[in-house]
Structures are given as C-alpha cells and as structure tokens.
C-alpha cells in the first residue's frame, strides 16, 4: 500500500485526518464528516506494510513493545502529519492528522473581534478552545 498516495489525496482533498484500520475501508475526515475512499477493506498485512514507510527501527521496536506509538511524519511538498498507530480488537489502526503549513489568522478562522481581543491580551491566562 502506497502511503504517500493516500496522504497526498488526504491533503489535496482538504481532509483534516486520514483514518486507516484493519477491517475497514480507509477514510478521510473532511469538515468533520468521515468519507470512505474508493478502496478495498484493509487487512493486517496492508497496515503492516505501512509501518516501515514511516517508522525507523527504534520506533518499530517501541511500537511492538507498547502496541501504540505517537510521532510526526512529513511528505515532501505536501505537509506534516501528527500520527498515532495503535492496536485494537480487529488489528492495527492509524490516524494521520494534517498539520497545516500556514497558520490561519483570526479573519480566516472567522473569529469574532471580541475573541480576537481576548486572545491578544498579554497578561494572564486566556483559553480559546474548540474541536481538535
């Protein structure tokens, strides 16, 4: 399985996440909605073929030991990803969260002026939170 093609599609389609899981069709999350890709259901062998594409030997050993690993990966010309691989009942699974190359400003995010002013306060602790 060519992970680079999957990640390229994910970025090009504007997806925030690429979800891979044994027993399921690969899916992307676009604007909060999970959308299946036009692919076959993933087998354990498919997932195992992905690991060497993104993990070095030390990371592979760590994953085998802990059955879970968090790391970052990059795809030249496309961007960076926060990655979590883990084991579940059906087998291995992984999620690639796209890290935007350009951080959006307040206007692009549609943040109201009152929240913008709060975020720019230079003393104290102000938390602006939302979905991840």
Map each language-model feature to its residues.
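The conserved Walker
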Residues: 131-132
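N-terminal "pre-motor" subdomain/linker immediately upstream of P-loop NTPase catalytic cores
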Residues: 1-118, 122-127
């Amino acid at each position: 399985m060519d992970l680079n093609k999957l990640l390229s599609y994910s970025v090009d389609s504007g997806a925030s996440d690429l979800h891979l899981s044994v027993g399921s069709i690969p899916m992307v999350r676009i604007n909060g909605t999970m959308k299946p890709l036009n692919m076959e259901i993933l087998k354990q062998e498919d997932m195992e073929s992905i690991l060497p594409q993104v993990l070095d030997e030390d990371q592979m050993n760590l994953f085998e030991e802990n059955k879970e690993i968090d790391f970052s990966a990059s795809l030249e010309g496309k961007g960076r990803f926060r990655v979590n691989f883990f084991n579940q009942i059906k087998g291995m699974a992984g999620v690639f969260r796209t890290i935007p190359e350009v951080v959006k400003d307040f206007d692009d995010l549609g943040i109201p002026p009152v929240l913008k002013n709060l975020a720019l306060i230079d003393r104290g602790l102000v938390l602006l939170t939302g979905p991840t």
